[in-house]
Structure formats: structure tokens, C-alpha cells
Amino acid sequence: MNADSRISPSIRADYLFMIEQAVRAPSGHNTQPWTLRLFPDHIDILPDFSRALPVVDPDHRELFVSLGCAAENLCIAAAHKGWLGKVSTAIDGIIHVELSRQDGIEAPHFEQIARRQTNRRCYNGSMIPDNTLALLKSIPIEPGIGIHLYQKGTQAFDDIAALVYEGNERQMGDPAFKAELRQWMRYNRKHQDETADGLSYAVFGAPNLPRFMAEFIIAHSLDAARQNRTDRRNIASASHFALFTTHDNRREQWVALGRTLQRFLLASTAAGIAHAYANQPNETPELAERMAQTLGITGEYPTILIRLGYAKASAYALRRPIEGLIVDEG
């Protein structure tokens, strides 16, 4: 490391703050599939393929969406500290966030980064009012990204729900899918605290049981009938589905979708709206294609599906300490 390339203590403190906010981004099974490199004028977000989900996400599409969410959090946190962040995605999938000092930058919904959570609870059935939907639709959308909202009580909503249930039938009938899911389950408080990642028992509202008991219960709960009973109740309690699409099925667009998704989630959080993923149809190419045809959005790639509504806050998933995520400094 050359002396003139070292990061000053004050800048490094700002960068560490940005990273703390970046890694609050959502990720599939809470794998947190990222590492970071710090340089005097930029931060790189790198995909960590050791935390990939080869069964449910074989093309790493959801992984790169998560990296895009992290990049958006980083840019918002940078603005909060008086830095302008400019994002670009390299062909190897590394996200480059160029940082420069700039006064008077808005940091939209910065306070919501810490409040945002994936809420898997049953919602209260209330509908989102039109003026709130208009606010959600007004967020900046990256080029090539589509956002489609479908209200409960419409045929489109019911069609999407049916594809979620069919997705459950396929995934829960796949032993490899269930094995991968169990790999990322964290069965009690001790287990979740040891790893600070994965799907904690707490986010599902489960009790803190001895691990052998929790593993037995989970092993006998992973079946399509049980999952569909849960999802029918949860979907019936929601107000809307939100479907996020890309026009090109490639990494740069997946990252752009993640940035747009994170803006939407933070705006939703600010409005008191809960969200949870219902991405089963998008994780099965045949179902995703059928959904695009059914909804009349052929030419777009359905990528992320969430349900929206109102609910009490849930438990927060843990995040790994950032010290272990920084792999290099310029």
C-alpha cells in the first residue's frame, strides 16, 4: 500500500458507516453474499459466491439483486455523510461505487434503512390507500426496470397467488431445495448468534427450543401442503402484490433492480407498510414465463415478487460484523 493511497482516518470512519448501512440489505435466506473493498475514492461490493444458493438461484440472479440493494443503501448512507455515490457494475459482477464530496445531497429515507425488515407475519387485511400507492409509484426507477402492482380482489392477484402455490408444490417436492433451505435455517438463539446469518427461528415467530427439537419440527414441516396453508392465509391478509421485472436478464439489470427494489422497500417502510417475499414463481423459469404471459408483460423478466400490507413489527434478522467483510483496502 503506497502512503499516498492510504485512506485517512476520517474518510475511513465515513466508509465504515456506509458499509454498516449497506449490509442491512435483504438477501435470499439471509445469506449476506457480499464482501467489500475500500479505496480512497471508492468502495467495491463483491459477490461472495461461497454464499450462493445454487438450487434456488442457480444463475445468481437474486444474489445480484441483493448486491444492488446493498449498493443503494451505501449510496443513501453516503449522501447522509455528504458524499455522492455513483454506481457501475463491471462485467465480472463487482459493483463499483465512486465517492466524491458534495454538499446538500438528499439522503431519501435514510432513517428507514435500520427499520426496514422482511415481515413474514400474517398481515391485518387493511388495504393500502391510493395516495400511499402513488407515493410508492413515484420512486426513482433505474432504466430497464419495471414495477407492477396488483390489488387483492383482482383476477391478476388471484393468478399470481395460484402460481405461488404451484411454486410451493414444485420446490417442496425437490429434496435438493429442502436440503439447501435447511442448510440456512438457524434453529435457536444460540445457533443464530453463532452465525449471525441465515433464517432465524425468531423471524418465523418460533419459540427458542433445543436445537434437536427444532430440527425435528422443521424437518417434518417442509411440505407443500403446510406451506400452501401458510401462504394462503398470508396472501389473503395482504393488500397488494408488487412484481419487479427487468428487460434484460443480465447482471447489470439485476443490480439495477436491486437498487430500485431497495428504494421501494424504504419508501414502503416510511409509509408503515410491511413486505415479505413470495418469489416462488420467479424461481421456476416455466412459472415465471407463464406469469409474464398471464399478466400481459411479455418481453419483461419477472424477477422479484413481494406481498404488501400492514402488520406488527417482526423480529429482525442478524447481520455479520463488518470487520469480517472487508477483504482489502487500497
What are these regions, as identified by a protein language model?
Residues 1-330:
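Acidic, surface-exposed loops and disordered segments
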